[in-house]
Design a protein with these regions (language model features):
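Immediate post-signal peptide segment of exported/extracytoplasmic ligand-binding proteins
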Residues: 22-33, 54, 137-144, 294, ...
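Ligand-binding pocket segment of bilobal, Venus flytrap-like solute-binding proteins
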Residues: 72, 79-84, 152-221
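Ligand-binding cleft/hinge of the Venus flytrap
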Residues: 49-56, 140-174, 285
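Gram-negative bacterial Sec-dependent N-terminal signal peptides
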Residues: 1-23
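A bilobed periplasmic-binding-protein/Venus flytrap-type ligand-binding module shared by bacterial periplasmic
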Residues: 116-127, 230-244, 267-268
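Short, well-ordered beta-strand elements
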Residues: 26-41, 58-63, 144-148, 252
Length: 316
């Protein structure tokens, strides 16, 4: 009986090892295509994810796409993963694709708390009395009738255009200035150097909250949402990708971030001029304990221990 028991235990151990070795993903899953819409927070989280994928033997490919193109690309099967679904502001953009089933939203936010997204002003403009959306029109002359947004097609820009179109708070004669995140911040730099009034899209996490003395406007609940556009950021995947590539999908589901993490990464990218991939690598080397969470239940693409492989790729 004892001999039988030892044999059974040994067989179970062999089966466990064999099962682990057989994990991983099919060869077709080796290429993982991610969208980066050009916001520094999404650039940083996408770079972190790609660094881990690479360490696991995958071949991540990051494409610079707009929001709309991201969703049409997922629908066509050309993009697998998008880490930048800011909610509730992006609901109208993603909704048609989610409703038809071509895009899947992971149930748990990758940034569950601390995010916000609404209009903001420099502290000195706020001190003059521009504290609410309803105050913007009163400052039309000093604002030169302009509100500064980011890239064309962005959801925040769309909300501003809606305010202008509907003459919400008397904004019908205002102009939305569209450019990019960096372009908008250049305008904020210029205005703050001169103490000129300016209204712009602000959000957290982002180094702008440290670099500038700024305030978020009240009164935007109907457009940007309550609590100064309080937001959560979700991960989206193309239909069936998780079932086709379950190991890579497990990593993606594990990718959860904090405001402090993202602020650190973005500061190095925006203010330090560092490459996002280098920022990710350096941070992981300095914080190897994060691998326990990111890589829980994840193997390499060919089924070997995931954490060992990533540590080797990082040189730790």
């Amino acid at each position: 009986m004892r001999k039988f028991w030892r044999t059974a235990v040994a067989a179970a151990a062999v089966l466990t090892v064999a099962t682990a070795a057989q994990a991983g993903d099919p060869d077709a899953c080796k290429s993982v295509r991610l969208s980066d819409i050009g916001w520094t927070d999404i650039t940083s989280t996408t770079a972190m994810t790609a660094t881990l994928l690479k360490g696991l033997g995958y071949a991540p490919k990051i494409d610079q796409l707009s929001e709309e193109v991201t969703y049409t690309s997922m629908k066509k099967g050309d993009t697998d993963v998008f880490l930048g679904d800011w909610e509730p502001s992006m609901t109208s953009v993603r909704k048609p694709y989610v409703d038809e089933g071509s895009v899947v939203v992971l149930p748990d936010a990758n940034l569950p708390q601390g995010a916000k997204y609404t209009l903001a002003v420099p502290q000195y403009t706020w001190d003059k009395g521009l504290k609410d959306f309803a105050d913007i029109a009163k400052f039309k002359d000093s604002l030169q009738g302009k509100i500064y947004g980011i890239e064309p097609g962005n959801d925040g820009n769309g909300l501003i255009l809606g305010l202008i179109k509907d003459n919400k708070d008397g904004l019908k004669d205002f102009q939305l200035v569209e450019s990019s995140e960096q372009g908008m911040l250049a305008q904020v730099d210029r205005a703050t150097r001169r103490n000129d009034d300016i209204v712009f899209l602000g959000w957290a996490p982002h180094p702008m909250n440290v670099k500038y003395k700024m305030q978020y406007l009240t009164g935007g609940d109907d457009s940007f949402g309550p609590d100064f556009g309080a937001a959560k950021v979700y991960t989206n995947e193309r239909k069936d990708w998780a079932s086709q590539c379950p190991n890579a999908a497990k990593l993606i589901a594990n990718m959860k971030f904090s405001v402090d993490m993202e602020n650190t990464w973005m500061d190095k990218i925006l203010n330090g001029g560092e490459d996002p991939a280098k920022v990710a690598t350096d941070w992981l080397k300095a914080n190897p304990g994060a691998l326990d969470t990111f890589l829980a239940g994840v193997t390499t693409v060919d089924g070997q221990p995931g954490e060992d492989a990533v540590k080797k790729s990082l040189g730790i």
